[in-house]
């Protein structure tokens, strides 16, 4: 055979021929490397197919796939020429790579035990690396000046292991992966680099290393990485060679960064985001941030809005609140901390600069921070004298108009908005202090039927000829059919005090009324208007009810008997309405615009009259909703300016007046009558005022409602209105005071 140095020269010049006879072009450290096992063409081709994507890191990198494609024909020739030379194993290997040395650092790894089969596989992999280096070297002649030294880790010297098995890289790698055997990495270094082998030995993770890539995946990933990425993705490999020394690295094991717990160099591409080391630092920053933010006068919403405008990351108030309360995840808090820190520094710097220049500079619209950070508005404080003036204005008018608010603001030298807000708050306070006495939960209050204020039509103006208009004020109350009815207060507009407050005493819900008269038959609704005038208090009361009457009396008829009513009413209305001296109740009804049908007075008590009223008479003046129902189940009593004494009540206690103005309040609360005691239509007649006076109206055989009174004094000082009951109710009581 020729000299190895002489053989390598024509091989490098031609670029083809036996790849096993190529050298690295160096004249020192010429040592033969034993290579064992015959290599067939198919095996060499399969081996090169697995390693054609290996990329070497050095001064100039080229794709191994291109170089292997260029040398595919020479590889086949190499395989053919190696077969006859393998029987003489030592001379052929000596001619293959005479200038490379294999350094085994077996003593550097403690506790590593390899079975003979694993040692054989390890050495076969070293053979594969040598062959790949030779193929790459023959394809890249410009790299011929760079030497390669392979340092591998093994438990026994290489010379003690026979190299008789053929190279089957793919199968052995799969076996090693199944056994979770972590092979050591191989590093090709310039031989002039005086490095200890221990520097290139990588301490592998335990056998359960996560994410162990297969060899095929590794070989396809390596060519896609650049030199910088290859170096950055291998934090476990530290190349301490001199700057002038070109270096190559070949990684045979999966390239993965080691856990942070191992003492390895940090990644070259460390994140630019500064991550806090532990949670304590985050807690301290969150606490400090909250204190400084409050000191600067910014809200959490201001901070989130400012970060969105200044840094492009818009955060809600909830996010800032959770950060301060440490309710975010550690990762999100780490992301948020630098932004909040930057905003806080900017806000403090701007605040300090503004304080030095002018105290109000931070609030100017020209400032960058204030444009997106609104200062918290200070609480408005009103002086005592201004508050007293506002209270006085509130007592005069609780709901002033916009012009009045402007006038008050000008007088007090205050802002109009402040005055408006004060009045609004004061009205709410008034509602809390003095809530409305009557419950407004009714679905159909009387206020919907009679708006307040409204004037009585067709009855009162014809009876009272005063110059002032008679008005009616109705407070919203529960409907009379509601079981929660306690009292119905109807107050008129009078010059006197509220002693004339009327109280309505109503029965329980009409659904339980025990009216069992078989002779009671439904009839069209009747509107009974009883107009009485009292000279003592100059009070006019109008009671409108919708009631069915018994059939023997006729349709829409009611009989009212009052012995002393004639003289009392005539005396009160003689000067005003110009009525004759013998004016009766029928005459007053006719004067009011009604159309009564008079019967012979001999059939009734003195002053009695039979009023035949058409439902349409008052229907035009009142709301149609009032006349829609044809049944009435509530007894109402309206008393003002005095009442009947408690001794004049019926013995059975069917009716009780309460809250009278002229006499002491014997009964202080409305008294509900038991529906079972309301036998209005079973007895003839029914005395609602005095049982002793009931005999006066006994001649009325078929009266459905009979009211009697023996003295004029009781009628003068009281206004009595009674309606019969027979089912559901639709009753409205209105009262007005004449001026």
Swiss-Prot record:
Biased composition (Low complexity): 81-95, 353-364, 489-552
Feature: compositional bias, Polar residues: 1-11
Residue spans binding DNA: 375-434
PROSITE patterns referenced in this protein's UniProt entry, alphabetically: HOMEOBOX_1, HOMEOBOX_2, POU_1, POU_2, POU_3
First-listed, main subcellular location of the protein, grouped into a coarse class: nucleus
Subcellular location: Nucleus
PANTHER family, per database record: POU DOMAIN, POU DOMAIN, CLASS 2, TRANSCRIPTION FACTOR 1
Assembly with partners or alone: Interacts with NR3C1, AR and PGR.
Name of the protein this chain belongs to: POU domain, class 2, transcription factor 1
Gene source species: Gallus gallus
Gene name linked to the record: POU2F1
